[in-house]
Amino acid sequence: FIRLREGLTRINVKVKASDEETEINGRGPIIADDELQALYAQLDALTEQDTLILAGSIPSSLPSDMYEIIMKRLANKHIRIAVDATKDLLTRVLPYKPFLIKPNNHELSEIFGRTLSTKDDLVTAAKKLQSQGAQHVLISMAGDGAILVSADGTVYTSPAPKGTLINS
């Protein structure tokens, strides 16, 4: 972990009232240059035995292409990198061949600029992202389960766990 001098971990609150859900997303911390250098030092220590997860939005004090910067920095280290991010954050890392990306079905629709409502639509979109560099694509669909398109093109589906969905 890297202790930051200013700010806290970003806090996100979801408020659910009947069938409507509202998101309140906190700003996140301010990351100073020396703290960023400490992150780079930790990243540089990773080996091919490690897996790195890049998830969520980037703090406003960092460059908007931070995920690309990290992936470029690690490109020759053969580290498995998984990315769970939205639209441009996700699509801009594809040339660096992430091991796994995890868009949800709504994010996929946003990336492709059209509603993707069937399993075939989602699998086709996942394969398009693979052609752009992603190795494995895991599509989450909240209460409808998930679809994994593996690097060899095999499609796996899983229902959502049984239970009462509180929020997504």
Regions found by a protein language model. Give the residues of each.
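Structural motif
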Residues: 1, 11-12, 21-23, 50-51, ...
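Conserved N-terminal subdomain of the carbohydrate kinase-like
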Residues: 1-51
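Short, acidic/turn-prone active-site loops that include or flank metal/cofactor-
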Residues: 27-30, 87, 105-108, 161-165
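Conserved beta-alpha-beta core of the PfkB/ribokinase-like small-molecule kinase fold
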Residues: 51-122
